[in-house]
């Protein structure tokens, strides 16, 4: 029998969560996936994901990435430089981040692993069950697609306070599908 990679839970109280979103502009959906699919998705991310690195050091700098599929000469020195730059920006109180990432949409569009599990994940995120859930929760009936990026926070990684408002790019709503195990602590 095939493993479930992405299956929504039957226990989501859509009406209550939609009311909360309407009141606050944000909502947390606990246990949005079935336990089996959450375990399988967590395993995919932990064992079959070639993580790159995304960084930003202050508002004036561009986001820099080290892609897992696009290694470049000098990446080791670049890594040291961007670690120092993100440290300095964070110390100054500027917007900064440093985390591991896998650009699911870019990987899909560029054919990194045609038909592989990350492609299938993106298809599930954009399939009717998930899109209908997001439309119902947000009241945004015109939503047609979702972007996707996997993000991993390892020791030394961080994300500064920020806004996910990307209206100029056509975004209507941002989402986070948190795959962290229960023992996680914010520090």
Predicted region positions:
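Fe(II)/2-oxoglutarate oxygenase catalytic core
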Residues: 1-187
